[in-house]
């Protein structure tokens, strides 16, 4: 039991109840006069409710509406509930992609700014893009475009933002855009000429099919700077397969721990196999009562 919240009029309070086993999560309202309880929202799953990573609760006004995060349709999305009638008003976001994080709620304008992953079908589904949508689910606008993962810095009046995006094989690009995502100009593009002169090489991105022969599995390869295509190298896979997140780097860096080991004469590979987080619910559920799997069938495939 946590997140206890009193209504402004003190006529009721709400709390979250995470049932033992993590298959039921409820928000329950309690009448402060007579102690009667009613469920406001209920999440159930035959496997698990990912309450520790995919949780967002935002009360609108005096609590008459609730913005709630859920995987109930198989993907992590936002929903708007009528808390007085104790029912869903409408999905705020929907589609075969996930909401990663809510960044800002404009209560008067009834809009939400949030981070999305997988919203561009032809890009790596782990890349973060930034979006805006109305609370009634209309007007979805993707504010970022570049084929990479994005970070935003807003102007104080939120009329403009600087979009910094990169990939492991693409040095950072900084763009100036307006609040609706319209491109204004490129501010700066990182110059790595001096870095390349040291012999440093970009990692290589790759995609392979998973154990089912259908699901795309995304990974990165690091080779020694003196790599010789004629030679044969031992391959080491860098593995941390905890189901609470994903681990393959997505943004550009000039230093990777994997590269340090590659310099000893190895090829390093890292993937995020089935059972890791931030894809579909089905993808994540592979870990259910199956932690020992650790994505190994997908690793064997590549």
Per-region residue spans from a language model:
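Generic, well-ordered alpha-helical scaffold segments in large soluble proteins
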Residues: 7, 16-17, 30-33, 43, ...
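A short loop-to-beta-strand structural motif that recurs across blades of beta-propeller domains
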Residues: 26-28, 77-79, 129-131, 173-175
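Beta-rich, blade/repeat-based domains predominating
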Residues: 4-5, 57, 152-156
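Glycine/Thr-rich phosphate-binding loops of Rossmann-like dinucleotide-binding domains
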Residues: 23, 76, 122, 171-172, ...
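Short, small/polar residue-rich loop motifs at catalytic or cofactor-binding pockets
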Residues: 23-24, 52-53, 74-75, 98, ...
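Multi-bladed beta-propeller domains
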Residues: 1, 30-55, 81-106, 118-122, ...
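Serine-hydrolase catalytic core recognition
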Residues: 10, 16, 144, 149-302
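Beta-strand C-termini and the immediately following turn/loop, strongest in propeller blades
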Residues: 6-8, 14-21, 28-31, 56-73, ...
